[in-house]
Amino acid sequence: MQSLLGAQPNQGLIDGIATLQALATSPEPVGCRELARRIGLDPTKVNRLLKTLTYLGIARQTANRKYTSGPGMHVLAAQSLFASGLIRRALPLLESLRRFGHTVALGVLWNDNVSYLFHAPPGLEASRGLGRIGLLPATISGIGMVLLAELGDEHVSSIYAGKEIPNFPEGLPQLLAKLAEIRQLGYARVHVADDRDHHIVAVSSGDPAHVGIALSGWIPDGSTPPLVEALREAALHLGE
């Protein structure tokens, strides 16, 4: 998860990472000016950053002079997942949680979004659950909410300053109240905003917490405690 800025943040590095993230999450090749518009940076600066990323092989330029992920980005992603051991440790635990017949998910918080490393509905092969969903707003996600609750109110306020907050029409005070409730419970229970009347139950893992595990589906209140117990056990083993 993102930490608060230190005394001397490197703005050039921050801009480079913002450019890298925007490129990584774009579903199709994107031009320099459009990418600059998305992240609110000067096109000249973004052009220099993209050319540097292309030189490093992290980005690549298409025939029509747009940019997309290069081989270096995929190598970095694979190396980080392999070196951390997170997926290797998580897969057996996630597979065990599928016994409840609900969707099983593993994700991490990045700014105001959640990136799902694993998301498998009932009946889906576990291998197909890897990387099948991209970014989602943290406040509509059980994993996002339980990881936001690990942050202090000041940090959460800085993330959402001047922004509309999905699922929280009354804004920041409503979100902070919900996060306080999650901290007290030790888990998140989030209603899915559609007509299925589904809920998500999620817990955090790690010390400090850096990843979330969740079950989602038709989960009545009375069915929540055993799911929380199973999630906590999985989170404990994942954090070892």
Give each language-model segment a name.
Residues M1-A83, G239-E240:
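N-terminal helix-turn-helix
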Residues A22, L49, R88-F100, E181, ...:
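Amphipathic alpha-helical regulatory segments at dimerization interfaces
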Residues R60, A105-G107, V190:
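Conserved beta-strand cores of small sensory beta-sandwich domains that regulate signal transduction
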Residues F168-G239:
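Extended hydrophobic
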Residues D15, K45, R89, Q174, ...:
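Charged catalytic carboxylate motif
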Residues A24, L148, G152, R232-E240:
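Short amphipathic alpha-helical signal-transduction/dimerization elements
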